[in-house]
């Protein structure tokens, strides 16, 4: 299972989290986010990581030009679109960056939210399901209704996100079969400041199901 720790802002923490066994680090490229980090600071962190660890840039309603600007500086391995991007825009991103993994995030409010995913499946590589919040796009600490996902089989790899913590992750995964999990606030002391002990606990708990 892929384990993505999102909202990395400090090089030392990124290195430590990768060394513990996380398979992906997420960098928030959204200026209004408290976890924002610019491309000039992302690249030095990426350079210290093993090549087996994915570096994912998280964008929300950004233009193609903005995304391209970040990628000219930071050698990301994946682009996560966490806003209201249309299938047409996702297609454009994939055409512009065919060598990168394209992840589309969806904020799940009701079962109807899952229906909207269908039109994206053919134009992206990976899905990410997050909790719905009317005011924030992610990192809210809110959990989504895991029961809605009991029969979720999208035909694409997918991440489970939304309020996951070391304490609730095993319960969240009961009856679900995501290809990965994504945590941010659940392993933090404050936005952008990761708690290495919590990451350690998370990975130890995940080993119990393997």
Swiss-Prot record:
Q: Which reaction does it catalyse?
A: N-(5-phospho-beta-D-ribosyl)anthranilate = 1-(2-carboxyphenylamino)-1-deoxy-D-ribulose 5-phosphate
Q: What class of enzyme is it?
A: isomerase
Q: Which keywords describe this protein according to UniProt?
A: Amino-acid biosynthesis, Aromatic amino acid biosynthesis, Isomerase, Tryptophan biosynthesis
In terms of superkingdom, the source organism counts as: Bacteria
Q: Which GO terms describe its molecular function?
A: phosphoribosylanthranilate isomerase activity
Mind telling me which Gene3D superfamilies this protein's record contains? Aldolase class I
Q: Which Pfam families does this chain map to?
A: PRAI
What residues form the membrane-spanning segments?
none
- Give me any GO biological process, just one: L-tryptophan biosynthetic process
Task: Name the CDD domains for this protein.
Answer: PRAI
Q: What is its EC number?
A: 5.3.1.24
Query: Pathway, according to UniProt?
Result: Amino-acid biosynthesis; L-tryptophan biosynthesis; L-tryptophan from chorismate: step 3/5
What the record says about family reads:
Belongs to the TrpF family.
Question: What is the protein name stated in its UniProt record?
Answer: N-(5'-phosphoribosyl)anthranilate isomerase
Species for this entry: Crocosphaera subtropica (strain ATCC 51142 / BH68)
Q: Which gene encodes it?
A: trpF
């Amino acid at each position: 299972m892929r384990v993505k720790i999102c909202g990395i802002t400090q090089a030392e923490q990124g290195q430590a989290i990768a060394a513990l066994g996380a398979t992906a680090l997420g960098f928030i490229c959204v200026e209004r986010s408290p976890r924002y980090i610019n491309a000039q600071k992302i690249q030095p962190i990426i350079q210290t990581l093993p090549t087996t660890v994915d570096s994912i840039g998280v964008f929300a309603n950004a233009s193609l030009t903005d995304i391209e600007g970040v990628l000219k500086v930071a050698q990301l391995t994946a682009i996560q679109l966490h806003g209201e991007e249309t299938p047409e825009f996702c297609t454009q991103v994939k055409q512009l960056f065919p060598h990168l993994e394209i992840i589309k995030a969806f904020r799940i409010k009701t079962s109807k939210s899952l229906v909207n995913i269908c039109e994206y499946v053919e134009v992206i590589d990976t899905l990410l399901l997050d909790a719905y919040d009317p005011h924030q796009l992610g990192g809210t600490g809110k959990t989504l209704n895991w029961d809605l996902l009991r029969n979720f089989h999208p035909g694409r790899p997918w991440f489970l996100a939304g309020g996951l913590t070391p304490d609730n992750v095993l319960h969240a995964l009961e009856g679900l079969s995501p290809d990965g999990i994504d945590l941010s606030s659940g392993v933090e002391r404050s936005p952008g400041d990761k708690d290495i002990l919590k990451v350690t606990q998370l990975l130890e708990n995940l080993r119990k199901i393997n």
